[in-house]
Amino acid sequence: MGKITKFVKSKVCNSTNRAFPLIVNHHTMASFQIQIISETLIKPSSPTPPSLKQHQLSDYDKTMHHMYTPVAFLYTSHGHGIPSTDEVSQLLKNSLSKTLKHYSHFAGRLVGDSHVDCNDMGVKLLEVRVRCPMAEVLKRPNTDAQDLVYPKGLPWSMAKEDILVVAQISYFDCGGIAVSADISHKIVDVASITTFMNDWAAMARNSSYKPSPQIVSPTILKMDDVPATAEDDNMKENICQSRRFLFHDSKIAELKALAVNSGAENPTRVELVTAILHKCAVTASTAALGSFMPNILLLAVNLRSIISPPLAKTSIGNMSSCYAISATHENRMKFPLLAGELRRSKIKLFQKYGKQLNESELLFLNSTDKAHESQKLSDGDNFDCFIFSSLCRSPFYEVDFGWGRPVLVYVPNCPFKNTFFLIDTPTQDGIEALVTLEENVMQIFENDEGLLAFASLIKDS
């Protein structure tokens, strides 16, 4: 049995004996209730040995915000034979406990910006009963879903406590289940989250499974001068709106033909979608402001396979960086040009750094390049920064706890302006883009005919 500490008695409430809060959420098309069943601390299945009691953050980890990075996995009961609520609860708690034995710092507590105290205090796990069928969530991903499958207000928030991981199991009336995780960016990037969730799921399917995460050594990523973690303009409070857009593979193929015919060298599907989104976002921003503003585009890239020698795919820690393109004149904001520049920037990064430099040199110089690019723009007029992250080709849809693959991997709306998240569609036949822009910019962006020629707006039904 895994180690479980309960600070709220786990007991399903009925209408005559409500021992737990009942949250009522009203929507124009439906009403639903969220009933908290339990809030639990899950500890590693065996104590962390003294030699591993302190996990030092790498210099790159230290530059990251202690912000909860969210992802949720939704499973329907149709044809999968999901066990009873009690069975699921014990299965997920015990498998999480066993998995944490191999991820001891996930169950520890952050100490300043220097290290994690691997004190086995545990991961917070909430269980909730959702009084509606999961179909209601699948029909309205823009509104209802977030508060049903995540702890309210937690995704993308700056952590107010030292807990590094918060998970939630949501039980729906139809028998469907959602499993979500909010993990501090101080200790993970997207690839790390993928590895952890797949290890947890594999442990649930087979209790004798042995995860083999490779914890990144803090000595790998040394910087001469570690920049302080600071709030950038994109993370300030703004009145923003989020929208989801669907790019079918057939439309991405059309984008590729346009780019290649104009001289771009075999851009990837992510680069193509990034280029058209960036073009249309800048066009909308220009219309809203009344004039063009110089801008920089940052696209995240996983460093594990780039550095020489490459790191294992199961390396845990922040091993992602960005490559950048910038535009100081409006005539550079043409789709084929942007697609070609993205491709060349990535190739330059791979060729210049991947083969010639070791890990620490790659990270330091790449960070220096980004800082120089930003400084070059900010020395003049104000500039806009557009940040893209891709979850495409990541094995999120392989996270199977024993009742099949998820019907949806759900990333909640992001509160930060000019952010874009790309993820494969559940049917693997396209890319879904989650876009967050300032409200006045979004009103123009979502009606851009140049965008809608290749993407469709995902609306709540």
Swiss-Prot record:
GO cellular component, one term: cytoplasm
Lineage summary: Eukaryota, Viridiplantae, Streptophyta, Embryophyta, Tracheophyta
Name under which the protein is recorded: Diaboline synthase
Species whose genome carries this gene: Strychnos sp
Disulfide pairings: none
Family: Belongs to the plant acyltransferase family.
Example GO biological process: alkaloid biosynthetic process
Listed PANTHER family: ACYLSUGAR ACYLTRANSFERASE 3-LIKE (PTHR31623:SF88), F21J9.9 (PTHR31623)
Keyword Ion transport set for record: no
Protein origin, superkingdom: Eukaryota
GO MF annotation: an example: acetyltransferase activity
Assembly: Monomer.
